[in-house]
Design a protein with these regions (language model features):
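Transmembrane alpha-helix/helix-exit interface in multi-pass inner-membrane proteins
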Residues: 149, 153-160, 197-207
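Alpha-helical membrane-spanning segments of integral membrane proteins, especially the hydrophobic core
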Residues: 79, 83-84, 88, 121-149, ...
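Loop-to-transmembrane-helix entry motif
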Residues: 13-21, 130-137, 141, 145, ...
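Hydrophobic alpha-helical transmembrane segments of multipass integral membrane proteins
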Residues: 30, 34-35, 86-90, 94, ...
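Residue-level recognition of transmembrane alpha-helices
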Residues: 24-25, 88, 141-142, 238-239
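Non-cytosolic segments of integral membrane proteins
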Residues: 150-176
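Juxtamembrane transition segments at transmembrane-helix termini in multipass membrane proteins
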Residues: 4-9, 15, 25-34, 39-75, ...
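N-terminal juxtamembrane cytosolic/stromal segments of multi-pass membrane proteins
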Residues: 1-23, 118-130
Length: 353
């Protein structure tokens, strides 16, 4: 399968399941309402009790003045601080859980559409896929988070080592220290970008492994890494999709940004544009997922099924070697009767007598 065929198949899959884009838009609306209810109301109560003028929030000078002495502020309004922090944590938990649930259902519908393209979209099927795929995807997300934390820790160690080398070089020559600082920074940035892109690609292909093979988190990630190592063109396909997603999302956000500079009216006008921008980003994200699922299915699942079916045809019995009747005249002729045996000895004796 070529890149163009995979991308075309991904767009075709999502265009036939446009309800998934509507689910993404509904998720954004629910998140906005949830932020207002869970976080906005406690913050409003806190601002009123703190004596903060809500009309001056655009300048943010009152907020900086309020938090100029954080220890005194926390000691004076401890219960309000705890309430606001708890509200933010609850909101993050709510948004993460709901987003993961919707993503599980969307990934399940996309994978099911690849297995059975004729199956139509239904809300019942969406919730069924979300229920089946939620916990495997949750544990997979937790595992990937640990991987990113480990990578960040390793890069932190390398950054500290580079800082120590540059500091030691400053004592000898400032020009050498400047050169080493720029050189190591560029190398570290290039390695970090390449490694993070590879990890993200393995993560997305791991979701495909998680759906089609129903493996565990570690096995899914490991098989995705092996798949990308054996078929490196799959990595370049995801790189192309990732860059396309970034470019289109940037232009979609750039269209709505100038309206923020217009007072009052700009905020009203920019909100529908932001909604459209979010819908476009959600649509492109689903297309990227569908392309990855399709490419992995065609190269790994479908090809392995074809390979396992070939030996069955190779060992088929030869028709000439089977025990079937022949139609040749020689084989269909009657079997000759055995020649008559000689007379028995007893009969010869009677005839002589």
């Amino acid at each position: 399968m070529t890149f163009a065929e995979a991308i075309r198949a991904g767009f075709h899959t999502i265009n036939r399941r446009m309800q998934l884009v509507g689910v993404q838009a509904l998720l954004m609306v629910v998140n906005c309402i949830g932020f207002f209810v869970v976080v906005g109301i406690p913050l409003g109560i806190a601002f009123v009790i703190f004596g903060l003028d809500l009309t001056g929030l655009t300048h943010a000078t009152d907020i900086f003045t309020l938090f100029s002495s954080p220890s005194e502020f926390i000691a004076k309004y401890l219960w309000l601080v705890l309430m606001v922090v708890t509200s933010i944590l609850l909101y993050l938990l709510f948004v993460t859980t709901l987003g993961l649930y919707v993503f599980s259902g969307s990934a399940g519908i996309i994978g099911r559409s690849i297995l059975d393209p004729s199956e139509p979209f239904s809300i019942k099927r969406f919730f069924t896929e979300a229920k089946q795929f939620f916990f495997p995807l949750m544990w997979y997300t937790f595992f990937i988070s640990l991987v990113f934390i480990a990578i960040a820790f390793v890069f932190g160690l390398f950054g500290g080592g580079i800082g120590a080398i540059v500091s030691a070089a400053k004592t000898q020559d400032s020009t050498l220290a400047l050169f080493l600082g720029i050189f190591f920074s560029l190398v570290l940035a290039l390695v970090a970008i390449s490694l993070l892109l590879a990890i993200v690609a393995a993560t997305v292909y791991g979701i495909a492994v998680l759906f089609f093979k129903r493996e565990g988190s570690w096995k899914a990630f490991k098989e995705a890494c092996v798949f990308l190592w054996k078929r490196q063109h799959a990595f370049w396909l995801y790189t192309l999709l990732f860059l396309g997603y970034i470019v289109v999302s940037f232009f979609a956000m750039l269209i709505s940004y100038p309206f923020h500079l217009i007072p009052i009216i700009g905020t009203i006008v920019s909100f529908p544009l932001q909604l459209v921008s979010y819908i476009v980003q959600g649509y492109l994200g689903l297309v990227v997922l569908a392309v990855v699922f399709t490419y992995y299915y065609e190269l790994e699942i479908k090809k392995s099924e074809a390979d396992t079916a070939e030996p069955a045809t190779d060992v088929a019995p030869d028709p000439a070697a089977t025990d079937e009747g022949s139609t040749s005249p020689e084989d269909t002729s009657a079997v000759p009767a055995p020649e008559q045996a000689d007379a028995l000895p007893g009969q010869d004796e009677k005839s002589e007598g």
